[in-house]
Amino acid sequence: MVSIGEVYLVLLGVFIFVPVTQMWINPTSLTEAPSSDESMSVVDSKASESIGLFAIVLVIIQFILDGSEMGYYQELTIGILSLCAGFLMLTFILALFGGVKIILFHLQITALRYSGLLLFSGLFFLLQSYKLNPTIQYLFAGFVLISWFAWIFHELKYLF
């Protein structure tokens, strides 16, 4: 099995790769401000969504911790959901900046989307820790994969 530390390293690496690549391709994003006041309303609504998602993540972590023993998948789930919570906090913190530059705006939106993907992945690993009908697990795995591929496609489309 893959070690949990390696999973964390890959997940953090993917997140860091996106804004670094955006800055490399478009260095003006460091100095530009968002183009309209609508972007600030997007930032505010995303911060509100991050708080709601954070509450869901905390409930799931508490549910896992209430169990008697923690296996590999429970530990992996808690780790991924902890990363998810960290990115949600980053989303909220970035909303506090008044004169948001485009790179911070994109970083906030990316953090929120990425935390959603981590939430979906964490729930998938939580399902793996229980003996359920494999059809349920495969169906959910399909949706998780579709979500990841859609996000990757979106980021690649934005970059190029």
Regions found by a protein language model. Give the residues of each.
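Alpha-helical transmembrane-segment detector that highlights a single hydrophobic TM helix
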Residues: 10, 23-24, 62-75
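Transmembrane alpha-helix detector for multi-pass membrane proteins
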Residues: 38-69
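Membrane-interface helix-loop junction between the first two transmembrane segments
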Residues: 23-40, 69
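Membrane-water interface of transmembrane alpha-helices
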Residues: 15-31, 86-100
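Hydrophobic transmembrane alpha-helical segments in integral membrane proteins
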Residues: 1-17, 48
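N-terminal leader/targeting segments
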Residues: 20-28, 44, 48, 104-107
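Alpha-helical transmembrane segments of integral membrane proteins
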Residues: 1-6, 69-160
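Hydrophobic cores of alpha-helical transmembrane segments in multi-pass inner/ER membrane proteins
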Residues: 12-17, 51-60, 119-122
